[in-house]
Amino acid sequence: MKPDYKLVAKAKYIHTTADLASEIWHEVYKRYYPGKQLDTLVEELQSAEAIEADIDNDVNYFLVVLGGKNIGYFAWKMENTALHLMHLYLKPEYRGKAIGRDIVLSCERLARGEGKGRMWCTVHAKALPVQQFFKALRYRNLKPAEQENGTVPRNELVFEHTL
């Protein structure tokens, strides 16, 4: 069964996405950040208010729905020459089932259709399985990411794929 992607626009879905983000981020990032720092990261970057501000800045959030259950979410922003994949998170039991790959490939098709020449994202420097995921999709590690916002330092790398 293939998942559906539901555009997050209404307040109800923004709050659903924020709750899902908090759940997944606390599972994914607990090995990289102490508890209070992680809580601050989630609040600054994935609270309902932060998601709403992103949406107001032309970021498109989507819930990933499979069999009526929210199993993850992703977000992207179209830039001048590229599509920036800002978030791609799935619940642990849905990883390794080609769902993330299909999301990345559909974003690449969208970017190509909009005449963009590349797609990029950031990955935590210690998240080796995620780096391998993007390398398998022909993304290359360009450089350390510059931190644009937030008070908690994030050790991230830029991965890019030329379309």
Residue ranges: model-predicted function:
Residues D4-I14, A18-E93, V104-S106, L110, ...:
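Acetyl-CoA-dependent GNAT
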Residues W120-H124, K135-E156:
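Conserved catalytic-core motifs of GNAT/GCN5-like acyltransferases
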Residues R101:
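Residues forming the Rossmann-fold NAD(P)(H) cofactor-binding site
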Residues V130:
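Helix-turn-helix
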Residues L90, H124-A125:
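Short amphipathic helical patch at the helix-1/turn junction of helix-turn-helix
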Residues Y94, A98:
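Glycine-rich phosphate-binding loop
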